[in-house]
Amino acid sequence: MASPGASTVFLLALTILAGTQALTPTHYLTKPDVERLRASLDRPFTSLESAFYSIVGLSSLGVQVPDVKKACAFIKSNLDPGNVDSLFYAAQSSQALSGCEISISNETKDLLLAAVSEDSSVTQIYHAVAALSGFGLPLASQEALSALTARLSKEETVLATVQALQTASHLSQQADLRSIVEEIEDLVARLDELGGVYLQFEEGLETTALFVAATYKLMDHVGTEPSIKEDQVIQLMNAIFSKKNFESLSEAFSVASAAAALSQNRYHVPVVVVPEGTPSDTHEQAILRLQVTNVLSQPLTQATVKLEHAKSVASRATVLQKTSFTPVGDVFELNFMNVKFSSGYYDFSVKVEGDNRYIANSVELRVKISTEVGITNVDLSTVDKDQSIAPKTTRVTYPAKAKGTFIADSHQNFALFFQLVDVNTGAELTPHQTFVRLHNQKTGQEVVFVAEPDSKNVYKFELDTSERKIEFDSASGTYTLYLIIGDATLKNPILWNVADVVIKFPEEDAPSTVLSKNLFTPKQEIQHLFREPEKRPPTVVSNTFTALILSPLLLLFALWIRIGANVSNFTFAPSTIIFHLGHAAMLGLMYVYWTQLNMFQTLKYLAILGSVTFLAGNRMLAQQAIKRTAH
């Protein structure tokens, strides 16, 4: 706990407000994210395709593979001159490696030119055109464009359209690329919006990232601003960079390509504004530090950062406006040492300028300025209810404890008065949490009251035993009085043992047994009452019911004894034996159903037994009919 004499301290806790009018980036590649992405791309080559993803992906991040000569040798040794895909991977990979030249034959050139046909898929056309471009070979751009347009009309998938954009970026600027450029607007219309924050294709992250990379590469090539709104760019960015771990090389490659496109294009460069660390600055150096970067966390050191205004959240009063940040290394600093901020929350409106490509360059930062609370003018009084005796007042200085004890009974009340001030500015404070806690030294009983300020911000707590006996359960004794001060903007929350107070209640109100009122004791265990079973009927009723059930069987035996049982026609043919065994089994199944099975299980078994018994019984009766006819 700090004393009132402690030095002034501002604690700044910064968050970017989500409720601002302009959409701000919620996901981007932090420096650890960039390193993780780099590690995902920097893998041993297993094929020419994997080499392409690694080499070109790392190149998008501004990094070369560790061993360029070894990578170039791998490309040459794995190149298949008769395969368009292999030529594409080799051409694009060698372009990203310094000093890696690959020579190809005329037959290979003819193979690539032949692949630029409307009979080829869009993927094959893209790979052939990009390979020709990578090897520096001439190409009839208008013919390639015609083949691409014709084939695209047959393949209307999102990925095929994205590959058409990638293909067009390798064609001559003299070709009429408007039909391909118009596809961008159609693709934007096919994007799915999620919660107003994310924008992506249902095909997934990889396709979305490739679309962003292809769009800006083509627009830089033709010199036209893409038909994508700024908010849509931020939504695409949020969707692409929301994933930090990548399942495949191709996915990591697509994210790296999108990041490079959003960081280095001629039209839209999203700005990321991040408070640096968790600042804790003294009054002599009250500084707000901001990192201003692109999506790859690369500092925008040429930017200009300005504070439009700073407003108190509570009063909405403007306390600072039109102030520039100072660039210091890779960060921008705002020194508000000369501004007397009272504790609380402030909304800082910050704008980044210096390049007309910047988007999402206006952000709102919520700044919490903490201070230290001081307790002054603490008076403890005992006031006679009849006012026949002058109040006895004792002043206490924090953090000391008052000497002696104070008495509150049926004749006199106890009162506590105090004020709370900002030790840095001297201004009065009204924290959110101001409690008086009374702790019974003998039983551990605790009673907590809220201290409220009056119109002059003087806090008062008065204890009248006749009015408060319910809270105390009329339990007399010596109570320790604690003062609790807390608030989110306070650097030094206070728990102060102020004094001992003897509270006396009338003996007739005292409880027979004083129980602890500790708020943190376990609750009484809940005993669950189960429903009592219904009474069984008398034994006579049960026996009578059983006799009635068995009476048909007894009647059967009696009739057999009187008229005789005709067993002369019983045969030991298989059908006869199976029929009677099946009938007995069904009766046994009824018993098992009663004791163990449910209805559905019983029906399943009954269907099997019944079918066998039916067929056997039918056969048995047929044999009996034949026997009678013969006689």
From Swiss-Prot:
Glycosylation sites: N106
Pathway membership: Protein modification; protein glycosylation
Transmembrane segments annotated in the record for this chain: 541-561, 572-592, 597-617
Membrane topology, as annotated: Multi-pass membrane protein
Lumenal side: 23-540, 593-596
Cytoplasmic side: 562-571, 618-631
UniProtKB keywords: Endoplasmic reticulum, Glycoprotein, Isopeptide bond, Membrane, Signal, Transmembrane, Transmembrane helix, Ubl conjugation
Signal peptide positions on this chain: 1-22
InterPro entries in the record: Ribophorin_II_2nd, Ribophorin_II_3rd, Ribophorin_II_C, Ribophorin_II_N, Swp1
Record localization: Endoplasmic reticulum; Endoplasmic reticulum membrane
One cellular component term from this protein's GO annotations in UniProt: oligosaccharyltransferase complex
Biological process annotations from GO: protein glycosylation; protein N-linked glycosylation
Keyword Amino-acid biosynthesis: no
Pfam families per record: Ribophorin_II, Ribophorin_II_2nd, Ribophorin_II_3rd, Ribophorin_II_C
Cross-link Glycyl lysine isopeptide (Lys-Gly) (interchain with G-Cter in ubiquitin) mapped to chain: K154
Top-level taxon of origin: Eukaryota
Subunit structure: Component of the oligosaccharyltransferase (OST) complex. OST exists in two different complex forms which contain common core subunits RPN1, RPN2, OST48, OST4, DAD1 and TMEM258, either STT3A or STT3B as catalytic subunits, and form-specific accessory subunits. STT3A complex assembly occurs through the formation of 3 subcomplexes. Subcomplex 1 contains RPN1 and TMEM258, subcomplex 2 contains the STT3A-specific subunits STT3A, DC2/OSTC, and KCP2 as well as the core subunit OST4, and subcomplex 3 contains RPN2, DAD1, and OST48.
Function: Subunit of the oligosaccharyl transferase (OST) complex that catalyzes the initial transfer of a defined glycan (Glc(3)Man(9)GlcNAc(2) in eukaryotes) from the lipid carrier dolichol-pyrophosphate to an asparagine residue within an Asn-X-Ser/Thr consensus motif in nascent polypeptide chains, the first step in protein N-glycosylation. N-glycosylation occurs cotranslationally and the complex associates with the Sec61 complex at the channel-forming translocon complex that mediates protein translocation across the endoplasmic reticulum (ER). All subunits are required for a maximal enzyme activity.
Family: Belongs to the SWP1 family.
Name by which UniProt lists this protein: Dolichyl-diphosphooligosaccharide--protein glycosyltransferase subunit 2
Organism (species): Canis lupus familiaris
